Amino acid sequence: MYLLTNNANSNVIVAALLLILGLVLIIKGGDFFVDASVWIAEILHMPKFLIGATIVSLATTLPEMIVSIIAVVEGNFAISIGNAVGSVTANTGLILAISAIFVGGVIDRKEFGIKAMLIMLSGLILFGFCLTGKFGIFPSILLLLILIYYMYETAMSAKRASLANKETSNEQVEVKKDKKAVITNIIKFVLGVAGIVIGAQLLVDNSQIVAKAIGISDGLIAITVVAIGTSLPELITTITSIVKKQGELGVGNIIGANIIDLVLILPICSFISKGNLEVAKQCAYIDLPALLVISSVAVIPTLINKKFTKVQGIIILILYIAYIVLAYLGQQGKLFY
């Protein structure tokens, strides 16, 4: 690991500081990586709608993905799965709730309905197969098929919006290609990847140390500190959209991040584990049901009313707090961990 001192208290303090450093590196590295990825896509003359629908969406999910991959390689399935599932629950129960409470917003029922259906379908697939205690290759393939459909539908939706604004799918974006811009973006790309990888390693290793020191499980710290930490970019985007009175921007960002977290991260981890991704009872009987309940409250009333309401946001936030308390009490009673 990263700690060499023999003093237990010093170990915990240093581990906590390294954990925070890991989060900072992940967040800043993610920013650099997204900026550089978009620049590269523009240099290759990718249509603007395709950049937004694919490159940005996948790039912003990289921090969660790297954290889960490192965890599964190290054999810590609790953090690997807990990070992915916990990030989706945190995005919905905390970040989306905040957006609904302070801004709300009318939604496009057709566009939102497709994404809502994919979130619920993905959650049900995860829940059903995780009850067996393992998440194997077959459900992973199902989720990847959902990912392919989601990326296609998102690209087509963005293309329709682009054409409505009298832009063509072949629009070429003017982008700086001078030597300084090339060097700057190459450095951003390298630093971004390095920041995410190093930050993820620090986060995974030191979260385990902190968890053991304060007497909680890897699973609990995964759905709280790790999941919320890797969801900070979405939180920042949402707060920015609230300040700018553009609630729909935050909602779109959250929904997209949730789908990709569910249908991309866990299948990759399952393939790495050769179909032997072990699922703790805590995840199967508390985390995933909580995800489904919170997601249902987020999407069903929204589809009916065509908007997010303040009351809905408050209910979602209360459910999320109740879930965290239940997870903690379950761990204290040694029911699942």
Residue ranges of model-derived segments:
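Hydrophobic alpha-helical segments, chiefly the membrane-spanning helices
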Residues: 1-337
